Curated annotation (Swiss-Prot):
Self-association and partners: Component of the large ribosomal subunit. Mature ribosomes consist of a small (40S) and a large (60S) subunit. The 40S subunit contains about 32 different proteins and 1 molecule of RNA (18S). The 60S subunit contains 45 different proteins and 3 molecules of RNA (25S, 5.8S and 5S).
Protein name: Large ribosomal subunit protein uL22
Classification via InterPro entries: Ribosomal_uL22, Ribosomal_uL22_CS, Ribosomal_uL22_euk/arc, Ribosomal_uL22_sf
NCBIfam families tied to this protein: uL22_arch_euk
Keyword Methyltransferase: no
Protein localization: Cytoplasm
Natural source organism: Candida albicans (strain SC5314 / ATCC MYA-2876)
The encoding gene: RPL17B
Recorded GO MF terms: structural constituent of ribosome
Gene Ontology BP annotations: cytoplasmic translation
Amino acid sequence: MVRYAATPANPAKSASARGSYLRVSFKNTRETAQAINGWKLEKAQKYLDQVLDHQRAIPFRRYNSSIGRTGQGKEFGVTKARWPAKSVNFVKDLLRNAQANAEAKGLDSSKLVISHIQVNHAPKQRRRTYRAHGRINAYQSTPSHIELTLTEEDEIVEKPVEQKQIRLNSRQRGRLASQKRLTAA
C-alpha cells in the first residue's frame, strides 16, 4: 500500500484516491485542487461541472503571471481565473473514484468532505523539436501526482444555552427580598 502525505484522523470514516504520473499540467491542477479543498463532495462536483461549462472559473492565486483576467474571479476575490478543462477532468475522475471507495466502506456520500487534496510534481517528460538551420530544441511536460482524502463529517450539535445563574451578595439579596415584600403588599 502506498503512503499518503496526510493520514486521516479517523481512517474508518475516510476514503482516499490517488493518481500517479498523470500527464496533466501541474500548475493548473494545483490551482484546481486548492479551489475545492475543504468543500463538500457534492458542492465540489457541481462546481467542477460548472467550470467545464464556463459558468464559473478556477481562481489562479499562485501561478497567475501572464494570464488574462475575468469577472468570474470576483466571487473568490481575484481578478485572474481560468477554465483548465483537462485538470478539472482528472480531479473529477479522482473524486468519483474516492466516492466509490467511500460507498464501498459504507460511508454516507452526502456527508463527505474533501479533507485533504495535494498535487505534487512527477518526473518531467523530455521531448525535442527540430528547428531551422539544423538546430534542436528540448521541451518538457510537467506531469503530476494527485492524492485526495474524503472524510465523513460529524453532525455538529449546538450546545444548549444555559441560563446564567446570578450570584448575589448578602446586601443584594436583602434589597431584593425587601422589594418583593413591597410589591406583594
